[in-house]
Amino acid sequence: MHAPRNEKEARPEVVYLDNNATTRVAPEVFEAMVPFLTEYYGNPSSAYGFGKLVEGHIIQAREKVAALVGATAKEIIFTSCGTESDNMAIWSALQTTGKRHIVTTQVEHSAIMNQTDQLERMGFGVTRLPVQPDGTLLLSDVENAIRDDTAIVSIMWANNETGVLFPVEEIASLVKRKREEFTKANPRNKGPFFHTDAVQTPGKIDLRHVAKSDIDFLSMSGHKLHAPKGVGVLYVKRRTSVVPYVIGGGQERGKRGGTENVASIVGLGRAAELALEKLSDEQVRIRAMRDRFEETLLQRLPHLYINGKRDQRLPNTSNIAFDFVEAEAILMKLDVAGICASSGSACTTGSLDPSHVLSAMGLTPARARSCVRFSFSHYNRDTDIDLALEIIPPMIEKLRAMSPLGPDHTDNFNYDVEAAREKEEKLMAATMAAINE
């Protein structure tokens, strides 16, 4: 589907099943934001009443976001996005502890993957933990990876591609116990701390117990819970030291420089309220919708697999391998039909490599390239699922019949498909050469 070319062109009607990439801004959120884009435009750092009025609304929004994780307002720092929050947490731990080792996983979002890659090039040590074939993580691997020079353990709460949930509260307690052991041996010890990228979780699972857990840092992003893009959150547990990552004025109590994005912060506060209001009912409804979608496809199509531990996932996420078909071909066909889905993280779009998440789970390159992620929100209805289920099975059957990768052309998908792919690429190259002549 293409974006409107001008203001008069109608917005294309779509069935949006890519809510792990971004979400629609809730009408209630937009309504809350409008006054701060028009009449209440004062700088919240100003000393006069007009600025103080605006500052008061930031204070209210901070309290609403804090309630989402059961925290106090002082534990909430507003940022520009989830990526900044992730980067800030890791940078802060490195600075406050003076240590040079980081523990993370092989399936993190690119915000963590690329930052730790950069830190590794700068001489820091990074341990990237493997995951099991179902996408889960072994606690013993985490414990064995922590060293006395570990500054921070950063493990996502829910994987953005598969929806698999990690036991972050247990991991946080493990990290705290290791920190206490190191401090007992050396009273001057600081760290390790625990950070979780929880960007995919608000509104999907209950986070109100976070502040009572041993989690030191937690990242969130507005556009993943029906707030606008361009605003994020870093929760910092009280009495945990934090070093500014964006250095400027004294905004955010000196923790994050730059004039606040007032309208988006107010919108995020309203989105946090809505997430708590809808959590229990919508969680059940969305899970039922997702499960019906998966079960129906499994009944109608052979050679189809659900990635990730089935009973340990976000209620809205489904990552499906459609063997013998390229995900790109599926997504193109879905796009023509007005259905939005993805082949992985929107933040790595354009990469020709298979998903690093699915590769870490042990999927062959061929199967990883056949995977499509569908992710639902409370704006999806049963009619959306009905339409998707009407379109997808015959579409997959047709694509398989056309593809040299299909079951009629190979006896063993996991073994022969790479040879079939090479044959297809050579045929395509010869065709293009003939056209160019």
List PLM regions with ranges.
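Pyridoxal 5′-phosphate
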Residues: 1-437
